[in-house]
Amino acid sequence: MLDQKTPELGTFGFVPGSAGNFFVGDFDLLLTSAITEKASVLSEIVLGEGDAQSFDVDLERVLFKYDYNDHVKTSFGRYHTGIGYYNTAFHSGKWLQATTDRPLLMEFANDGGLLPTQAVGVSVTGSIPSGSLGLNYIAEYGSSDTVRPELDTPDREEDENNGNHINVGLFARPDWAPGLQIGGSFYHDQISDFQKGPNVRLGQTIVNAHVVYTAHGIEFLSEGFLLRHDYEQNGPAYNMPAFYTQLSKKFGHIRPYFRYQYINANPASIFEDVGLRHGPSFGARYDFNPNIGIKAQLDHTLRKDLPDLNGLQLQLVFAF
């Protein structure tokens, strides 16, 4: 439910329907099969509701995986990019999240998110011999054809026409602090800005740093990003900061949580529909048992030169 008719919610992009409505969330199917001791196949298929009770089928991931050892684990196919922490920790599963939705910055591009969240190519990850420091790496090379609907005009899409990307990341999971992860990543590709012309290209660089702690019933997630769009042929360059911080603590069956997110997208960039927006989310999740839960979340989003958005989301989640 929203306090205005525009079907936009600052933390999710937009939702189907009008100011207050019911809608079916994602139906996520995860299929895995071992081929040999080291080779396997993974696929993730999501059925999501569109407008007017129509449904879309998304092949979120399909991977041929080969784990040579703990230091070299390869995946070939369609994957969720390892930009930061959230995208590869929660994937498409609403069940896995404490909140009803992903931070807008980390939302999938087809739901209005800013990042190239999916790609086709090769991903390699593994541990680095580092003793108690627990270092791990990730390296990816592939194509991410990002098409995102604009938040203020959902029927209008922004096709970034991405070139091949490279993404590298490093993170530590020290033995002396179970549940702690500290790391970062660097992503680069080239994209198009068709609003400025059919041949306008720019370099896109995304730098991430994150600190995560998940232990003793506590979930603390904090990620900061710098998105840089550098136009070719002596064009402008835009540096756009963004972050989110989320904290929750489980008490028996209930997990109250708080999240604050911030995005400062340059209005002259391809993210002119996003602009400057920030605000808190408050909520709680109640798990009836290990397979059924319900969530309630209140969002307040401040937007530059636009009215504030207030939203209430209620969500039933289950796993089987």
Segment roles from a protein language model:
Residues 15-17, 108-111, 154-157, 197:
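Short, P/G- and charge-enriched loop/turn segments at secondary-structure junctions
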Residues 140-157, 193-194:
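Active-site-proximal beta-alpha loop/turn segments in soluble metabolic enzymes
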Residues 13-17, 54, 62-67, 75-78, ...:
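Outer-membrane beta-barrel pore domains
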Residues 9, 19, 104, 150-151, ...:
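General secondary-structure edge motif
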Residues 1-12:
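Transmembrane beta-strand segments of Gram-negative outer membrane beta-barrel proteins
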Residues 1-3, 17-146, 162-166, 171-177, ...:
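Outer membrane beta-barrel
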Residues 154-164, 308, 314-315:
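Hydrophobic secondary-structure block in the mid-to-C-terminal portion of proteins
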Residues 113, 159, 236:
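Glycine- and other small-residue-rich loops at beta-strand/loop junctions that grip anionic moieties
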